A protein has these predicted regions:
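Conserved catalytic core of the tyrosine transesterase superfamily
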Residues: 1-182
């Protein structure tokens, strides 16, 4: 749940060294936005709009969408960019390897798996789990399905409905507890 995510992103689990700041920012960005692994790997520094607090994401079939950013991830991104500046990298890719080169999908996957392994007991530990958690937490907190669909970059509502399974189970539980004849 939300508590597990707070535990995962707890500052005490990270140092102020570049790799640690990057890793925390990656996990935090996945949870804050629900973007896909390939979308995160391909982000450019200029895709972040701090003034309007959003990020331009290039999704499947080169479809662009604008995803809002919360205060917490804005703070994380600003701190990360300070650390990233130490590289004076020629690439405009947002996330870099420890050597200052463009990050790649497999490395991002390993980072997320490692961070989740240190805190969570779930069997599955991947960027997609964070995407799923983002969608589930949004729906549980009352976000409408269509808005979540747009945030995730889904073309059809059917693709988004996959994430409502947990929410439906939760509704059944509430119904059984609350309805006089249930």
């Amino acid at each position: 749940g939300v508590d597990k995510m707070n535990l995962l992103l707890d500052d005490n689990n990270f140092t102020d060294e570049y790799p640690s700041v990057r890793d925390r920012t990656i996990v935090s960005l996945f949870y804050a936005t629900g973007i896909r692994l390939s979308e995160l790997s391909n982000l450019k520094v200029q895709d972040i709009d701090f003034y309007n607090q959003n990020i331009k994401v290039t999704g499947k079939r080169n479809k662009e969408r604008i995803v809002p950013l919360n205060q917490s991830i804005v703070k994380d991104l600003k701190h990360y960019l300070e650390k990233r500046a130490e590289f004076q990298s020629i690439t405009d890719t947002l996330f870099l390897t420890d050597k200052g080169e463009k990050i790649y999908n497999k490395m991002v996957y390993r980072i997320v798996n490692k961070q989740m392994s240190s805190v969570l007991t779930n069997k599955k530990k991947s960027p997609h789990v964070l995407r799923h958690t983002f969608a589930t937490h949004m729906l549980d907190a009352g976000a409408d399905l269509n808005s979540v669909k747009e945030l995730l970059g889904h073309i059809s509502i059917a693709a988004t409905q996959v994430y409502t399974h947990n929410t439906i189970e939760k509704l059944k539980k509430v119904y059984k507890q609350a309805h006089p004849r249930a």
